[in-house]
Every structure is written in C-alpha cells, then in structure tokens.
Amino acid sequence: LEIPDINSYNLYFGWYLGELEQNDEFFDEYHEKYPDRAIGFSEYGADANPQYQAAAPEKGDYTESYQAVYHEHILQMIEKRPWLWATHVWNLFDFAADGRDEGGKHGENQKGLVTIDRKTKKDA
C-alpha cells in the first residue's frame, strides 16, 4: 500500500466528539508509530456565539468562553509539536451555512475567529 508523501487530519476532538486531549494523543501516537512521515492538522475549530459566555465553559455549549479554551489548548498542543508540517484553523470568519441551526443562529457556521459581519473579534 502506497501512502501520500504527506498526510493531514481533520479532527474535532473536543468539539464534535471526545475530549480536547485526544488531539494530543492522536498526533503523538501517529508520530511515534511513523516518525518519518509528515503529518498536519488540516482543520480544527469550535463554534462560538459571542452573546454566549460561561464561567465554566463546556464542550458544545457554543460559548465564546469555550472557543477560547479550545483554541488555547490547540495552540499549546501545536507549539509543543514542531514536527507538525501544517495547521489550519477553521475558520477566520463565521460564514453562511444554510443547513445549520445551532448556537442561537440559523444558517451560520460560527467557528470563525471573527463574526460574519467582520466587526467583532472573538476572544479565541
């Protein structure tokens, strides 16, 4: 079986499934098993509605507070793994997504670091 020269994984541990730490575990286990293969993080993010805040944020609560926790964890994880060849936050801006009705907003993916109108930088 031939594999590509590089691989990237689109993981959402800590948002759609599992816990944040599973991102760390996945990449560490992959790198330990295949130390000579390039691996990247092709997509990661967590939805946030800036109107939602929490003193004790939790996965799936759509709070700006949890989005900040999520990205702080991911950035620390990336910083500790210089062997990751690429990382891609999803997404710079919130964007239209007609089929979505989550986090208090219909028709919008709220994984952006900035609101859909480009006016509010989220605390991520």
What are these regions (language model features)?
Residues L1-A124:
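Extended substrate-binding grooves/exosites of carbohydrate-active enzymes
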